[in-house]
Amino acid sequence: MQFIALTSIGIENLLVDELTELGATVSKQTVGSVRFEADSLLAQKVCLSTRFATRVLMLIEEKEGVDDKNSLYNFARSQPWQEWFGPTQTFAVDFNGTNDSLKNTQFSGLVIKDAIVDYFNDLFEQRPNVDKQDANVRVVARLNRYGVSMYIDYSGPRLSERGYRQGQGKAPIKEHLAAALIKRSGWLENVNQPLFDPCCGAGTILIEAAGMARNEAPGLFREGFAFERLPSFRAAKFKELKEELLGNIIDPKLWLIGHDYDAQVLGKAIDNAKRAELDDIIKFKQSDATKLTAVAKLPGVVISNLPYGERIGSMAELVDLHRNLGVGFKKHFNHWKLALLGMDESLFKLLKLVRLKRYKFKNGPLDVELNLYQLDDKQVSLTTDDKKALNFEGSMSFANRLKKNKQGLKNWLKQNEITAYRVYEADIPEYNVAVDIYGDSAVIFEYAAPKEIDEKTSEKRLQDVISLTAEQLKIAPENIAVKVRKKQKGEEQYTPMAKQNRTMVVEEFGAKFKVNLFDYLDTGLFLDHRLMRRYIQENAKDKRFLNLFAYTGTASVHAALGGAKAITTVDLSKTYLKWGQDNFDLNNISNTRYRFEQADCLKWLEHATAQYDLIFLDPPTFSNSKRMKDAFDVQSDHIKLLTWVKKILSPSGTLIFSNNKRGFVMDEVGLIGLGLKAVNISDKTLSPDFKRNKKIHNSWLITHG
């Protein structure tokens, strides 16, 4: 009988060795799978014993030239289905693969389903029912460029789901991948040596390690396998097999230690260990991996699935973690072996360790790599006691500028009650970032590097920027958000991650605003508009104020605090309007004439008839809008936009027009044609923290001529 064992990319060689050790004959290895020959009892032993396979399928038949509906139907119809189930049982069909004729996997699955139903109708005048969730038998078909392979699901649900893990942390590791790390680490060569995971999360690596060291077949305590529903299954033989495997379990002296800083996740690890009946073997402790200390007097092996940065803005924490891990390992883990899993090569380099070997894997959809290190005397001697060792000595120029800029803003910040401000704006060309402070937190925004700058050099400089920002500004790494521009699939973009939902309140000129530094590209407050908002507050008394493209309504808050008699806040985003209402609540603002309207601002202008005495217009540089035949571009379309706004600007009203397009040129002729006049106030709207970047925005006061 032929079977195929499925696994994840990178684990195939380990699976081949495992199958061979179990007595199976391996006939073919491909990406993500291994084909082997075995009798039914040996195949059942594989299902019970495998640490590396995720699923085992039994081959029914494979045939070349099956490439359309008719040939697929005939191929499925010709199989002796009564050998595997009867007309009173249920079945399901999984189909994988497409071609020019079979373009839809669901349709192809239905073709096979129809063939099976017709087969039983002809043979028994009775048909089995389909049960997609809990079928007695699951048929699996795989289409490739040569033809179709037909299988019966032999193992059932994922073999990697051992049953002990009901709780997990962020970025969990799959059990079969954890087993692969343990095997590759070399720890199994001497299971009496300590095994330590400083970022243990839900404890998966340690629980897998204990099971492997005890020679425990992971499927022994599984509730059931798909093969138990097949006619060929012999319960007595299977019982004997399980008793044999139970007898193979040993009880070595194990020294397993797991640390994690997250008490909640650590609680899940403890619960998982209890379910695996290993809670008396594995010792868990809440501890910060950035402050490593010795965990054993004898050297052992460190195996850890390091954090990947699964949350946007967590890069600062990752840089801090890896730099401190490197120092901690060298100080307290001499003669230990390290096996560390991660995604980012540049972060591994922060360990300042010479890699012994590297293995590439997949953790779900993520490309990850396992790096092996040997902490011998030579490795340890490479370090210094300075945990903030920089990639470049020249990075201290950034640190000095950061410190100087902050000191220079100190009096101005205090006088104006400002707690959110820019402290660095690409002052030094090599350090092409902006750094904004928000209370006890910060945002580092990386600008696109020139093409001639090597990407790895930029990464290293950014790492230094992160460390020095934390050090010089005395901000905890977990409170530093980093917005990094990276190339992905040919496009340069900022990639959002899972949201943290962390908000805080900042102040300016007596106003309070809610900001979110981690979940979006922008924070909820455009710092460069600060003086425009103050102008609005100072000139809003008893006026009708309109805020277009309002974002989180911060200008509207200032208008309200300035005594505006009516305020209309318009934005397309429901999220941002709700945010704006939160800002009103923060400032105890309540008035029936203060309205929020969700709308496309260009579309809204088409129907607007009310008059406004003070208007703030801050359109995007570029946008798609149903109001425009083509996409909106502020340079080419600003006169058209001002034409619409003019209609609702009261005779003595003032329009504050601003945009962020570099090199923007006002169409003065077009403006005169509209009967409007404009005064450029760009320089006057730059507060001290933005004086270093005079091109941050363009702004005008526009009135009727």
UniProtKB/Swiss-Prot annotation:
InterPro entries: 23SrRNA_methyltr_KL (IPR017244), RlmKL-like_Mtase (IPR000241), RlmL_1st (IPR054170), SAM-dep_methyl-trfase (IPR019614), SAM-dependent_MTases_sf (IPR029063), THUMP_dom (IPR004114). One of its GO terms (cellular component) is cytoplasm. It is an enzyme of class 2 (transferase). Keywords: Cytoplasm, Methyltransferase, RNA-binding, rRNA processing, S-adenosyl-L-methionine, Transferase. It catalyses: guanosine(2445) in 23S rRNA + S-adenosyl-L-methionine = N(2)-methylguanosine(2445) in 23S rRNA + S-adenosyl-L-homocysteine + H(+); guanosine(2069) in 23S rRNA + S-adenosyl-L-methionine = N(2)-methylguanosine(2069) in 23S rRNA + S-adenosyl-L-homocysteine + H(+). SMART domains: THUMP. Disulfide bonds: none annotated. Its main location: cytoplasm. One of its GO terms (molecular function) is 23S rRNA (guanine(2445)-N(2))-methyltransferase activity. CDD domains: AdoMet_MTases (cd02440), THUMP_AdoMetMT (cd11715). Residues 42-154 form the THUMP domain. Its EC number is 2.1.1.173, 2.1.1.264. The keyword GTP-binding does not apply. PROSITE patterns: THUMP. It is found in: Cytoplasm. HAMAP family: 23SrRNA_methyltr_KL. PANTHER family: RIBOSOMAL RNA LARGE SUBUNIT METHYLTRANSFERASE K/L, RIBOSOMAL RNA LARGE SUBUNIT METHYLTRANSFERASE K_L. Specifically methylates the guanine in position 2445 (m2G2445) and the guanine in position 2069 (m7G2069) of 23S rRNA. Belongs to the methyltransferase superfamily. RlmKL family. This is Ribosomal RNA large subunit methyltransferase K/L. It comes from Pseudoalteromonas translucida (strain TAC 125).
